[in-house]
Amino acid sequence: MTKKMGLLVMAYGTPYKESDIEPYYTDIRHGKRPSEEELQDLKDRYEFIGGLSPLAGTTDDQADALVSALNKAYADVEFKLYLGLKHISPFIEDAVEQMHNDGITEAITVVLAPHYSSFSVGSYDKRADEEAAKYGIQLTHVKHYYEQPKFIEYWTNKVNETLAQIPEEEHKDTVLVVSAHSLPKGLIEKNNDPYPQELEHTALLIKEQSNIEHIAIGWQSEGNTGTPWLGPDVQDLTRDLYEKHQYKNFIYTPVGFVCEHLEVLYDNDYECKVVCDDIGANYYRPKMPNTHPLFIGAIVDEIKSIF
C-alpha cells in the first residue's frame, strides 16, 4: 500500500505584483514599514532587472520538478506538494495548516537554499515545527545539500563551460568567485553556525573537480542593519583581486542561491559587472540551477540519505 506524505518546499518568497512590494518589505523588516526612499530603491532595482523578480515562477517550477522526481524515486510513497514562503503568502504556517486539513501526518521539508545556517534554513524549520506541533504532524528536515555530488557536478560543469569561452592562454588570468548571501557575523558566531565553512567546502569541491586554477570566496547582498556582516563583499573582493593579481576574467558563481532572482540579476549582473567594467576585466556568470535535473537530483539524493 502506498504511503501518503507531505513535501513542504520552503523559500524566501518574492512580490507577485507591485502592490505587494511594501507589505513584503515590511515583513522582511519584522513589521517595520520601509521609508519612501527605501521602498523606491527596491522598486528601482526590480525595474532595472525588467520588472518583478522571476523568483515566484521559478520557485513553483522547482517545487513541481522536485515532487515529480521524488514520486518517481519512491515506489511505495506518494508525496503531496505544499509550498511555504517566509515573507509572502502562502506562508509556511498556511502550508502546514493545509497539510493538516488534507490529513497529512508526516512530511519531508526542504528549503531552497543549499547551505545550512540557523538564520536561514533553521528559521524556516523552526516556523514549520511550531505550526506542525499544533497538529501532531511529524516533520523530517533536509538541512543542506551542497555536498551532494550532483550539486557539485552542476556547478563544475558550468565553470568548465564558462572556461571554454575564454582563450586557453588567459585561464591563468581567470578567477572564480564563489559566493552566498551574507549574514550577520554576530549571529553566525553566537550560534556557531557551519554556514561559512559550508561555502568554503563548496568552493573547494568545485576547485577539485573543475578546470579552474584560481578561486576566491565572497559574500553578497548584505542587509543594512548597522552591524557587521560576513565579508568580503563580492564587489570589494573583485577590486582587491584585480589590484593584487590583475585578473582579466572574473567568473561569478553565487552557489548559495538556486535560481535567477534580484540578488543575482542585480547584485551580480549589474553591481559586479559595473566593477569589472571599471577595472577593464571580463564578467561571466553561468546560468543558475533553476530546475536542472542535476540540481533537483541532488535534493532527491539528500532526501534518500535521511528518509
From Swiss-Prot:
Q: Which Gene3D superfamilies match?
A: 3.40.50.1400
What family is this protein classified in? Belongs to the ferrochelatase family.
Report the GO terms under cellular component. Answer: cytoplasm
Annotated PROSITE patterns: FERROCHELATASE (PS00534)
Write out the function statement from the record. Answer: Involved in coproporphyrin-dependent heme b biosynthesis. Catalyzes the insertion of ferrous iron into coproporphyrin III to form Fe-coproporphyrin III.
What HAMAP family does the entry give?
Ferrochelatase
Q: Enumerate the Gene Ontology biological process terms.
A: heme biosynthetic process
Reactions catalysed: Fe-coproporphyrin III + 2 H(+) = coproporphyrin III + Fe(2+)
Q: Does the keyword Cell inner membrane apply?
A: no
* Leader sequence residues: none
Q: Where in the cell is it found?
A: Cytoplasm
The UniProt keyword set, sorted, is:
Cytoplasm, Heme biosynthesis, Iron, Lyase, Metal-binding, Porphyrin biosynthesis
Top enzyme class: lyase
Annotated Fe(2+) binding lies at H181, E263
Residues annotated as coiled-coil are none
Q: What is this protein called?
A: Coproporphyrin III ferrochelatase
GO MF terms here are: ferrochelatase activity; metal ion binding
Does the record carry Iron as a key word?
yes
Extract the Pfam families matched here: Ferrochelatase
Main localisation, per the record?
cytoplasm
